[in-house]
Amino acid sequence: MSNKIINLGSIEIANDKPFVLFGGMNVLESRDLAMSIAETYAEVTQKLGIPYVFKASFDKANRSSINSYRGPGMEEGLKIFEEIKKTFNLPLITDVHEVHQCAPVAEVVDIIQLPAFLARQTDLVVAMAKTGAIINVKKPQFLAPHEMRHIITKFNEAGNDEIILCERGSSFGYNNLVVDMLGMDEMKQSGYPVIFDATHALQRPGGRADSAGGRRAQATELARSGMALGLAGLFIEAHPDPDNAKCDGPCALPLHQLENYLKQMKAIDDLVKSFEPIDTSK
């Protein structure tokens, strides 16, 4: 098995390369907050030598409640993304939920994300593929790791092979997710880059009646475990005031802890990727 390399400017995304951070905030709450969070991430990742892609959503279309905050919308969100890209010279990732969003979003961001709940929607997959952008596929909570090959095939047959696979936990009864570490290794066998969304894997879906709960206190333990697999990247969201974040605050890393958190993740990644592979199947 050879590891596919996704080239994003000077950044190489692959399972055997130094990990890439996909990080930022869950949803765009305001222009000023987005700029502040992007600046912190940019400074910390540059200091630590970690390749970095800024992440935020312009619309959270799958909130538990119709009254929950969704975001500024595509038009305003893309303006904020353009300013972040220009100011900090950062590549960008965001998610799309509808076919008509794909082309305009791909004109601004570098990676477009297929949400886990929509990963089997063929029309959306085809529209995303046709943009030619790099695609980050969130593994649905209800699919087995080996079933990701069907989504890969859809993208391939629609003309796009620039695919990243993202683990975000699997349903485990009601209102709970668990992370199958062997499942991530199974996805790596495809050769495509695999990243670990350690933020959303902490969710307790529907755990707060009208919104998702989370287990922020275990953010470090879960991410350490994932990084020990030797992955292409880590996906995390942070917030300066998680308890008052407009979406997924219970899962968000406190922004002031970002540097120490990433120091540990980089140390694990460097160590694991310095090892010689051991084939225990023989």
Curated annotation (Swiss-Prot):
Transmembrane segments: none annotated. Keywords: Cytoplasm, Lipopolysaccharide biosynthesis, Transferase. GO terms for biological process: keto-3-deoxy-D-manno-octulosonic acid biosynthetic process. Its EC number is 2.5.1.55. InterPro entries: Aldolase_TIM (IPR013785), DAHP1/KDSA (IPR006218), KDO8P_synthase (IPR006269). GO terms for cellular component: cytoplasm. It is found in: Cytoplasm. It comes from the Bacteria. PANTHER family: PHOSPHO-2-DEHYDRO-3-DEOXYHEPTONATE ALDOLASE (PTHR21057). This is 2-dehydro-3-deoxyphosphooctonate aldolase. It comes from Shewanella baltica (strain OS155 / ATCC BAA-1091).
